[in-house]
Regions:
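The feature marks the mature, well-folded catalytic cores of soluble enzymes
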Residues: 1-283
Length: 283
């Protein structure tokens, strides 16, 4: 699989400039000033391109999974579902298809491993820790797969994480370094388990824990969802005290990268951030 450090272009949904014109203008200006090449994905129905765009194994090899997330099954949300095959055809990208149901936000490359939450089992009608299914995943990715826990106790709770995306918990920083969100503030037991699992596989995990008087949990979960294109990182900011500390975490964990922040409350209010709205590849 292509690593973030190897990528040189980022794709964005054609709907991003329609739905969020102010943010779009600021983001494109930042990309241009930062020297990040960007392109548009035509024919999308929502902005969350990370979830449905294919996995890049090599410069010319792409894997296309079945994008059937449970959170878009309701009739009122079906109109937001983009057909990945259609947009890839428009882009001239040839993909090798698979019947596996996978959500792109639940694919986090960490060196020789791919990290996914255990939601991938239920999405495919499998029992948790199904060894044969894990073997299929590993054959699919050509990587060892690490499964981390995910719990959604009440999907009707507006603050519940019903997505189950691993990119909302961790971000690989090269070598054996992994940066982890402040999930401990929300679910300490689950966060502890995630950290222990990653450490069992030899990773040095640093948690984003904030030293501020009143933490803003409405926003500070989203810092981990940053975008890296080559040695350049674009991460969220929200105009809160945690912004500076989050920037320091990302800079210290990625010392060879340049890091910029962008205000994105309007995007994060919809439960996603920079990684969710982007698809970076090597061309």
């Amino acid at each position: 699989m292509i690593k973030d450090i190897e990528t040189n272009v980022v794709y964005l949904s054609d709907k991003l400039q329609v739905f969020y014109p102010d943010f779009w203008g600021r983001l494109i200006k930042l990309f241009d000033e930062f020297g990040i090449l960007w392109k548009i994905i035509p024919g999308t129905n929502d902005i969350w391109v990370r979830d449905f765009m294919p996995i890049q194994l090599s410069e010319k090899e792409f894997l296309l999974y079945q994008y059937e997330p449970d959170y878009l099954q309701d009739r009122s949300y079906r109109k937001l579902k983009t057909d990945p095959s259609s947009v890839c055809s428009l882009l001239g990208i040839k993909c090798r298809p698979t019947k596996m149901v996978i959500d792109g936000g639940n694919i986090t490359l960490c060196g020789d491993y791919v990290v996914m939450t255990d939601k991938v089992f239920t999405e495919n009608g499998k029992k948790k820790d199904d060894g044969d299914f894990i073997a299929q995943l590993e054959n699919f990715f050509q990587k060892k797969v690490i499964i981390i826990p995910w719990h959604c106790i009440d999907p009707n709770d507006e603050n519940a994480d019903f997505f189950g995306h691993s990119d909302g918990f961790i971000h690989w920083c090269g070598g054996n370094k992994v940066l982890m969100s402040n999930h401990r503030e929300v679910d300490p037991e689950e966060a502890k388990e995630i950290k222990q699992i990653m450490e069992k596989y030899g990773f040095d995990v640093r948690e984003m824990l904030f030293d501020v008087k009143d933490q803003d949990l409405d926003w500070n979960w989203a810092y981990i969802n940053y975008l890296q294109v080559g040695n350049k990182i674009v991460m969220p900011a929200f105009g809160i005290p945690e912004d500076k500390q989050a920037l320091k975490y990302v800079q210290e964990c990625n010392p060879d990268c340049e890091v910029r922040q962008i205000r994105m409350r309007d995007i994060a209010a919809k439960c996603g951030a920079m990684h969710c709205i982007s698809w970076n590849i090597k061309e």
